[in-house]
């Protein structure tokens, strides 16, 4: 099971039927929808602001999602795929999108 850690009184909330890789790290104010997959070596850092992830989202291996203190949250819409080793630092990604490295 993934490492899930409470920070500043916030505990991650994972939706129904989600896959969490054994070495994924999910910290703080993170909420996912249902049917998501969080793959190996992925880090979701909701330690200084919130991360909201829609339904059917796929966050692939090695990706890091990190918010900006008192500036920006992360919002990911439904059916988004975040490619391998992508860093998202305070952003809003609309539904049915794909992000990747070139």
Show which residues each predicted segment covers.
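Domain-scale signature associated with acetyltransferase and cell-envelope carbohydrate enzymes
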Residues: 1-95
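Conserved small/polar residues in nucleotide/adenosyl-binding loops
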Residues: 98-102
């Amino acid at each position: 099971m993934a490492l899930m850690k409470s920070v500043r009184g916030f505990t991650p909330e994972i939706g129904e039927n989600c896959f969490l890789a054994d070495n994924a790290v999910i910290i703080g104010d993170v909420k996912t929808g249902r049917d998501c997959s969080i793959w190996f070596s992925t880090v979701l850092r909701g330690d200084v602001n919130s991360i909201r992830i829609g339904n059917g989202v796929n966050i692939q291996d090695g990706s890091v999602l990190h918010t900006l203190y008192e500036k920006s949250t992360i919002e990911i819409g439904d059916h988004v795929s975040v490619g391998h080793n992508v860093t998202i630092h305070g952003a809003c990604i609309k539904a049915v999108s794909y992000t990747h490295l070139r």
